[in-house]
Amino acid sequence: MSNVIVVGCGRVGSQLANMLSDNGNNVCCIDKNADAFANLGRNFNGSTVQGVGFDEDVLIRAGVEECDVLAAVTQLDNTNLMCAEVANHLFGVPHVISRLYNPDHERAYMQLGIDYVCGTSLVAEDVFSKIVSGHGSHIDTFGEFEVLRFTLDLSRR
């Protein structure tokens, strides 16, 4: 079981928080808008903290000092970048992952050594793969390695 902080409680953040919580992790969601916590639903077992995700006091209230993983998944690249940097450099969170909205910012994230997921690129690559090959789709990239999904039609033997 891990202690996880999810910054941003929109569609992605709330779904991620619920998935992590349902998987037995201790999850705390941070969002500047208290109304966003309604996205978590009634069955969410974690905690919530209202505030800005890169504010030190907010992170401390969320349990950053015992945190194993922080996922910054707001819709703002600069906010996610700041959250990742504060969690990593000020608090030494072992694993920090950031959502990247604009693929043009990818180089900056790479230069800073921040793990990121770019939904825009993932969707574009997935659609491209389906158009070009019709057989496989890109799931994720981890450094030099890619995870791919393939569908096999065994009836065409």
Cite the ranges covered by each PLM segment:
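Cytosolic regulatory regions of ion transport systems
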Residues: M1-R157
